Amino acid sequence: MARIAGVDIPNDKRVVVSLTYVYGIGLPTSKKILAAAGVSEDIRVKDLTIEQEDAIRREVDAIKVEGDLRREVNLNIKRLMEIGSYRGIRHRRGLPVRGQNTKNNARTRKGKAVAIAGKKK
């Protein structure tokens, strides 16, 4: 297994798919990285030469991925919460941030439903 950006990428898959195992690299970014590195998308990871691996590593190092990207996303969310913006308040309350309705759904964000005591007989 080759290690790129601190992540073991699978040997038996095509390089373009294997790079998507790195947080922050999807299929479009993976294709751009391989084009810039001059590596074919169809080649398997186990068939890469050392020079090709180094070229891919250089391209990936130029992009914010893994820990740096996670840290930036978390800092952005904390900043929104500190300035008291609508999005920050929604994050703080654990509600959907992007305008979804909460009357019926949003269970993923709100957590498990809590039963309310009904009318006693």
Curated annotation (Swiss-Prot):
Q: Which GO terms describe its cellular component?
A: cytosol; small ribosomal subunit
Q: Which UniProt keywords apply?
A: Ribonucleoprotein, Ribosomal protein, RNA-binding, rRNA-binding, tRNA-binding
Q: Which GO terms describe its biological process?
A: translation
**Compositionally biased intervals (Basic residues):** 106-121
Is Metal-binding tagged as a keyword?
no
Q: Has keyword DNA-binding?
A: no
The entry lists its GO molecular-function terms as: rRNA binding; structural constituent of ribosome; tRNA binding
The record's PROSITE patterns line, in alphabetical order, gives: RIBOSOMAL_S13_1, RIBOSOMAL_S13_2
The source's superkingdom equals: Bacteria
Gene3D superfamilies registered for this protein in UniProt: 1.10.8.50, 30s ribosomal protein s13, domain 2
Quote the SUPFAM superfamilies the UniProt record gives: S13-like H2TH domain
Region Disordered, as annotated, extends over 94-121
Q: Report the protein's function.
A: Located at the top of the head of the 30S subunit, it contacts several helices of the 16S rRNA. In the 70S ribosome it contacts the 23S rRNA (bridge B1a) and protein L5 of the 50S subunit (bridge B1b), connecting the 2 subunits; these bridges are implicated in subunit movement. Contacts the tRNAs in the A and P-sites.
Question: Subunit details for this protein?
Answer: Part of the 30S ribosomal subunit. Forms a loose heterodimer with protein S19. Forms two bridges to the 50S subunit in the 70S ribosome.
Q: Would you identify the family this protein belongs to, as annotated?
A: Belongs to the universal ribosomal protein uS13 family.
Name this polypeptide is given: Small ribosomal subunit protein uS13
Organism of provenance:
Streptococcus sanguinis (strain SK36)
- Organism lineage string: Bacteria, Bacillati, Bacillota, Bacilli, Lactobacillales
